[in-house]
Curated annotation (Swiss-Prot):
GO BP terms: protein quality control for misfolded or incompletely synthesized proteins; rescue of stalled ribosome
Catalytic activity, EC: 3.1.1.29
Gene Ontology CC entries for this record: cytoplasm
InterPro entries to which the protein is assigned, alphabetical: Pept_tRNA_hydro (IPR001328), Pept_tRNA_hydro_CS (IPR018171), Pept_tRNA_hydro_sf (IPR036416)
Lineage, uppermost ranks: Bacteria, Bacillati, Actinomycetota, Actinomycetes, Mycobacteriales
The protein's name: Peptidyl-tRNA hydrolase
Reaction equation(s) it catalyzes: an N-acyl-L-alpha-aminoacyl-tRNA + H2O = an N-acyl-L-amino acid + a tRNA + H(+)
Species: Mycobacterium avium (strain 104)
Catalytic residues as annotated in Swiss-Prot or TrEMBL: 22 (proton acceptor)
């Protein structure tokens, strides 16, 4: 039997961060778990919360690291090892300052764009060659510090669109699982 794909939503644990821009990865992971009809449970060896089952016809483990974003690799690395998942079979869902709010893009590899959660995952895996579902949160206004911006809640105007954006990101993740990168990019990047 083929090893599962590992889908990781990045975010920060705790109610204080639940509605922040940095937590869209967690929001999408929650939607994927609901689509699988499962609830997250603790994975003792890694410390992350996981759901395992089928998604888009494949065996999948969806994970939410329960450490802070900048330390995500500390739990993603052990999960990948436990399930024998190579970097190319890992999908990381994360916020992206370099994309306009609501834009979704798929890619594999590349730089981290200053995203310390991605950097932590890359370091833990010893590779940047994992798949990514990038969810645009836009740039901070004026001279606002990007580190502070990502930890703020969405504005009331943005908040109205977040559920739809997260549903689209979950759809994009399922297309990536079902079709592979290039065919999924062709569809998602046309949205």
């Amino acid at each position: 039997m083929a090893e599962p794909l590992l889908v990781v939503g990045l975010g920060n644990p705790g109610d204080n961060y639940a509605r922040t821009r940095h937590n869209v990865g967690f929001m999408v992971a929650d939607l994927l778990a609901a689509r699988m009809g499962s609830k997250f449970k603790a994975h003792k060896r890694s410390g992350a919360e996981i759901v395992s089952g089928r998604l888009a016809g494949r065996s999948v483990v969806v994970a939410k690291p329960r450490c802070y974003m900048n330390e995500s690799g500390r739990q993603v690395g052990p999960l990948a090892k436990f399930y024998s998942v190579p970097p190319g079979d890992i999908i990381v869902i994360h916020d992206d300052l370099d994309l306009d709010f609501g834009r979704i893009r798929l890619k594999i590899g590349g730089g981290e764009g200053g995203h310390n959660g991605l950097r932590s995952v890359s370091n833990a895996l010893g590779s940047k060659d994992f798949q990514r579902v990038r969810i645009g949160i836009g740039r901070p206004p004026g001279r606002k510090d990007p580190a502070a911006f990502v930890l703020e809640n969405f504005t009331s105007t943005e908040r109205a669109d977040v559920p739809t954006i997260c549903e689209q990101a979950a759809d994009a993740t399922e297309l990536l699982i079902e079709l592979g990168l290039e065919p999924a990019q062709n569809r998602v990047h046309a949205w």
